[in-house]
Amino acid sequence: MEEEGVKEAGEKPRGAQMVDKAGWIKKSSGGLLGFWKDRYLLLCQAQLLVYENEDDQKCVETVELGSYEKCQDLRALLKRKHRFILLRSPGNKVSDIKFQAPTGEEKESWIKALNEGINRGKNKAFDEVKVDKSCALEHVTRDRVRGGQRRRPPTRVHLKEVASAASDGLLRLDLDVPDSGPPVFAPSNHVSEAQPRETPRPLMPPTKPFLAPETTSPGDRVETPVGERAPTPVSASSEVSPESQEDSETPAEEDSGSEQPPNSVLPDKLKVSWENPSPQEAPAAESAEPSQAPCSETSEAAPREGGKPPTPPPKILSEKLKASMGEMQASGPPAPGTVQVSVNGMDDSPEPAKPSQAEGTPGTPPKDATTSTALPPWDLPPQFHPRCSSLGDLLGEGPRHPLQPRERLYRAQLEVKVASEQTEKLLNKVLGSEPAPVSAETLLSQAVEQLRQATQVLQEMRDLGELSQEAPGLREKRKELVTLYRRSAP
C-alpha cells in the first residue's frame, strides 16, 4: 500500500538532476507490521527520489520535502538500530516516513541533508520570481507604487538627484541671459568721461522775458520768492550761496592779506578770472580802481532811500546786477554746465559777496572786504563747486551744448588767470630760494606764450563785434596783465 505523500514517477534521466546526497537506506513500508526494504535514495534540492536498484532508471517514489516539518532521530527501544523519521507539517495529508541507516554517522549526515532539503522546499515560494504585467507602474520615472501609506523620508541618493536636477535647471536658464555676472562699476576720475551721458530734465515753467535794467530794482530782486526766480540762471544761483560761502571760509583764513578790487561795469563772467589777483599784485590793482566804487555807491544811494528802507547789500551790487542782466539779455543765457562753473570758485550769483560787504556802510571803500569770508576757494576741485542754474538744472544734469563764442572767451580768460597764478607762485618760490635763471626763463616764456594766445583770442572776439561795449574795460584789464608780467620778471 502506497502512502499519500509518495508519488509514482516515470522514467527520468538521473544525470540531468542535481544530486545533493545518495546512498542505500532501509525504508519502512508504513503499516502495523512495517516491512523494512533496502532502497537507493537520491536527494535532489527539495525532492527525495527512491529507487529499487542503483542502476535502475525507473523511480519508485518521489517525496516532496516541502510538505514535512523536520527530520529527527527516532527513539527506538533498541538503541543499536540507527533510525530517523520525517515528521509531516500540520495541515498536510502526508504520512511520516521512517528510515534506518547502517551506521550512526550515516544517520546524522542524512538527518542534516534532509533538514536542508526541507528548508529549501519551504523557501521555494520566495525564490521564484513571478512577473505580473498587470501590476506594472504607469509612469516610467516612478520608482515605487503610490500607496496609501505615509510617505517615507527621502534618502541621501534622492536628495542628491534633486540637487543635481535643480543645478541643471539653473544652468539651462542662465543660457538665455547674455551677462549673468554682477555689474562692474569702474570709477572714473576724469570729468569729461561722464559728459556724453544725458539725463532727461524735469519739466519747468516757461521763463519770463527780462525787463530793462533801469526798471529793475535790487530790492525787488531780493524779495522775490524762490518759485519766480527759479527760471533765471543769474538769480537762481542765490540758492547755492550758503554752500559757496561755507566752501570759501577755509581759504579766507589763508588769504586774509589779499584785497578784493571794487565792482565795475563788467559782467560777472568777465570778472571771474580778473577779480581776485594774488597777494603780490593786490596793491597795484587797488591803486587804479578804489576811486570808482564810492562814486557808484553814493550815486545809487540817493534815489533808493526815499522809497524803501535802506538795504546795504542790494545797494552795493546794483550796478553789478544791471550790467550782468543787460549782458545776458544781449547775448542770451549761456550753457549752465560751462559758464557758471569757474576754476577759482567764484560764480555768477550776487549773494555770496553780500556777507562780506554788509559789514560796512555804502560809502566805505572796498578795502573793508579783506576780512570777508567769501573769498574764492582757489584749490577746490571743479566737481565740488556749487552749480549756478535753475531749479531744473539743480535736479538733473543738463545736456551739453556746443561752446558759443562768449563761452570760448570765458574759458580763455580762465586759462589766463590760472596761468598767471601758477607763474606767480613759482616766481615766489624762485625768489625765496637761490636764483635759478634757467627755470625762471622757461616759466616766463611759457607765461608769455599763454598771454599771447589769450590776447589773440580776445582780439578776435572783439573784431567780431561781440565785445564792443566792454572795450574800455578790456583795455584796463590788459594793462593789468602787462603790469603783472613786468612785476613777475626777475
Swiss-Prot record:
Residues annotated as domain PH: 18-119
Biased composition (Acidic residues): 244-257
GO cellular component: extracellular region; ficolin-1-rich granule lumen
SUPFAM superfamilies: PH domain-like (SSF50729)
Region of interest: Disordered: 173-402
Keyword Protein biosynthesis: no
Phosphothreonine: residues bearing it: 232, 298, 311
One GO BP annotation of this record: macrophage apoptotic process
Gene3D superfamilies in the cross-refs: Pleckstrin-homology domain (PH domain)/Phosphotyrosine-binding domain (PTB) (2.30.29.30)
Residues with PTM Phosphoserine: 164, 167, 235, 237-238, 273, 390, 468
Keywords, comma-separated and alphabetical: Coiled coil, Phosphoprotein
Cross-referenced InterPro entries: PH-like_dom_sf, PH_domain, PKHO1/2
Coiled-coil region list: 439-481
Pfam short name (any one): PH
Skewed-composition ranges (Low complexity): 230-243, 277-297
Cited PANTHER family: PH DOMAIN-CONTAINING PROTEIN (PTHR15871), PLECKSTRIN HOMOLOGY DOMAIN-CONTAINING FAMILY O MEMBER 2 (PTHR15871:SF2)
Protein name: Pleckstrin homology domain-containing family O member 2
Record organism: Homo sapiens
